[in-house]
A protein has these predicted regions:
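Glycine-rich anion/phosphate-binding loops
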Residues: 65-84, 117-129
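N- or domain-start disorder-to-order transition segments that initiate the globular core
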Residues: 9-51
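Conserved, mostly hydrophobic/aromatic
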Residues: 60
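Residue-level signal for functionally critical sites in structured catalytic/ligand-binding pockets
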Residues: 45, 49, 65, 93, ...
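N-terminal beta-rich core of secreted/periplasmic extracellular enzymes
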Residues: 33-46, 78-91, 97, 127
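Active-site-facing alpha/beta catalytic cores
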Residues: 2-6, 87-138
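Alpha-helix C-cap/termination motif
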Residues: 50, 83-84, 137
C-alpha cells in the first residue's frame, strides 16, 4: 500500500518569525525616544485627569505605506504641535494595517514592499524602526 503525502503539499517554504525580544535587540529604543514616550503619556494622563487645561488631538494617516512620507508628516506635525502647544497637545496616530480591507494590500507589516511578498518578518522590523524614528523627533 502506497502512502500519499498530504501534509504541507502546497507550502513552498517555512520562514521563522523574529520574536519581539529579537526585534527589540536589533532595534533598541534610545533614551530620547523613551523620554518622548514617557513624557507624552504623562501629559495625556494630566489632560485626562483635568490637571492640564489643554485638549489633546490625535491625528495621522490611515495606514503608513511610505515611511519617508510618514516621517515627513511627523516632522511637519511636530512643528505644528510646538506652535499650538499652549492650547493643544497633538499626538500622531500611527497605524500600519488596513483592518477593513478585504481585498488588496493589507498593510505595511503584512506586505512592506507592496508587492505581495508578505515579508511580515521585515514588516515588523520596518514598523518598529518607523515608530522609533517618530519618537526620536521628540
Amino acid at each position: 500500500m502506497r502512502t500519499i503525502d498530504i501534509e504541507n503539499v502546497n507550502v513552498a517554504a517555512f520562514d521563522t518569525m523574529p520574536t519581539p525580544e529579537e526585534i527589540h535587540a536589533r532595534l533598541p529604543i534610545s533614551a530620547k525616544a523613551t523620554k518622548t514616550v514617557t513624557h507624552g503619556r504623562g501629559l495625556l494622563r494630566k489632560i485626562l485627569e483635568r490637571k492640564d487645561h489643554r485638549l489633546f488631538v490625535v491625528v495621522g494617516p490611515c495606514s503608513i505605506h511610505d515611511p519617508v512620507a510618514g516621517l515627513d508628516y511627523a516632522r511637519r506635525l511636530k512643528a505644528l504641535a510646538d506652535e499650538v502647544g499652549d492650547t493643544l497637545q497633538i499626538i500622531m496616530r500611527v497605524y500600519f494595517e488596513k483592518p477593513r480591507t478585504t481585498v488588496g494590500w493589507k498593510g505595511y507589516i503584512n506586505d512592506p514592499f507592496m508587492d505581495d511578498s508578505f515579508r511580515v518578518d521585515i514588516g515588523m522590523e520596518k514598523a518598529r524602526q518607523f515608530l522609533l524614528d517618530v519618537a526620536e523627533l521628540g
